[in-house]
């Protein structure tokens, strides 16, 4: 079994950091990720810099990323202005977020869920016309910080609506880390049944220590792509307490011990997580860098 891990640390991982990370360090984070074997990277977001100052240098970051065959860089886009900026940087794919509840959608994007679907559809058409891959993420698919539980029926109805714009991929995001494996299986299997042939990706937070169990459940239910953030850094700036993306290195350890291939070197990602903690000025939440892999490498072994 092979799984694609989509690295989100450069965007989702850093966006909540109060201290602005130097552009050169953002580019180095991406370079190290590519060197470790990651082939899909969410590099930037093209959003209002007044709302997310950390992403104000999106164009400069994209200008400095290594262009390696087989590596795809994604940019988060909310509106036409963001898409204009993204297309000007030769981004490989755009990701658009549609939030599953009206309250969170208004807080995050200043629009209702229905308006978010309309925005996504318009952006998807423009991206397709420009030859850019387009993906859509349903945020708060497992629960909302303002409205509470979100029914599976409501999420799957939203899947049906966003699928009308023919996305290249649909993602389900546990934005505040409240999902559980049973719910993950229901939504992933339901999404796959509604959009056969469209890859399903999942984005989990480990806020309540369920992120890795949810990742395994997603794979069992048919998802083939998992988001993860080096060091376990990140979270949504518009969702209270939405900390703790699952850590790329910890996810890789789990997958590799289960004999699931990724093409990524966990030890290299772990070293990057340690380096990132030094850049940010505090240790990262990921555990592999502290505990080490298993079985331990023998002295002199390759």
Which residues does each PLM region occupy?
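Catalytic cores and adjacent flexible loops of soluble metabolic enzymes
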Residues: 1-302
């Amino acid at each position: 079994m092979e799984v694609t891990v989509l690295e989100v640390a450069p965007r989702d991982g850093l966006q909540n950091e109060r201290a602005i990370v130097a552009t050169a360090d953002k580019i180095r984070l991406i370079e190290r990720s590519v060197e470790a074997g990651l082939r899909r990277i969410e590099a930037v977001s093209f959003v209002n810099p007044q709302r997310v100052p950390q992403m104000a240098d999106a164009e400069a970051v994209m200008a400095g990323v290594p262009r390696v065959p087989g590596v795809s860089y994604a940019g988060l886009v909310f509106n036409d202005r963001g898409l204009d900026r993204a297309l000007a940087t030769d981004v490989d794919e755009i990701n658009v977020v549609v939030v599953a509840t009206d309250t969170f959608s208004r807080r995050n994007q200043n629009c209702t869920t229905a308006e978010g679907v309309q925005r996504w559809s318009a952006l998807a058409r423009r991206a397709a016309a420009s030859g850019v891959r387009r993906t859509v993420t349903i945020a708060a698919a497992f629960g909302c910080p303002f409205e509470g539980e979100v029914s599976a029926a409501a999420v799957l109805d939203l899947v049906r609506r966003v699928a009308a714009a023919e996305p290249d991929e649909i993602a389900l995001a546990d934005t505040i880390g409240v999902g559980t494996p049973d719910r993950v299986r229901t939504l992933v299997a339901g999404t796959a049944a509604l959009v056969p042939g469209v890859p399903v990706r999942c984005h989990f937070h480990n806020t309540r220590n369920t992120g890795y169990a949810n990742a395994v459940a997603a794979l069992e239910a048919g998802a083939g792509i998992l988001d993860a953030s080096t060091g376990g850094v990140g979270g949504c700036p518009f969702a209270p307490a939405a900390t703790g993306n699952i850590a790329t290195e910890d996810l890789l350890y789990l997958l590799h011990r289960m004999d699931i291939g990724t093409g990524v070197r966990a030890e290299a990602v772990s070293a990057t997580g340690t380096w990132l903690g030094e850049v940010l000025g505090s240790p990262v939440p990921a555990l592999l860098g502290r505990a080490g892999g298993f079985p331990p490498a023998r002295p002199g072994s390759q």
